């Protein structure tokens, strides 16, 4: 699961809200190997997911998926798969965060936006996004 925090989600004047957490789950065949096969991608859109099983080849670059943050005008933003190239984001594992950072993510009130990778949410998000029948 890759997660992003946005302080404000306001695609239209007068609409939107403070705080937005979005994430994409990349489902792989074997996390133990150097270049696992990407089986599916499930980007979040507020409380739901879209699923690509398997992802289109032009939306994958090697072992990376191409994800964009897009406006779902007029209400909000969401993550989606894209064919466009972009920048790579550093991967920071939950275990790499300091105790203070994990504690802040666990306890900060983000309103209706919830931290997808914190202990109380992680497994539920995986279950909800499960793309395989």
Curated annotation (Swiss-Prot):
It is found in: Secreted. InterPro entries: NPP1. It comes from the Eukaryota. Its main location: secreted. A motif (Conserved undecapeptide motifI I) lies at residues 1-9. One of its GO terms (cellular component) is extracellular region. Induction: Expression gradually increases to a maximum at 7 days after inoculation of pepper leaves. Belongs to the Necrosis inducing protein (NPP1) family. Secreted effector that contributes strongly to virulence during infection by P.capsici. Causes large necrotic areas in both host C.annuum and non-host N.benthamiana. Key residues/motif important for the effector activities are degenerated in most NLPs, including the nlp24 peptide consisting of the conserved region I (11-aa immunogenic part) and conserved region II (the heptapeptide GHRHDWE motif) that is important for phytotoxic activity. This is NLP effector protein 14. It comes from Phytophthora capsici. The lineage of its organism: Eukaryota, Sar, Stramenopiles, Oomycota, Peronosporales. The gene is NLP14.
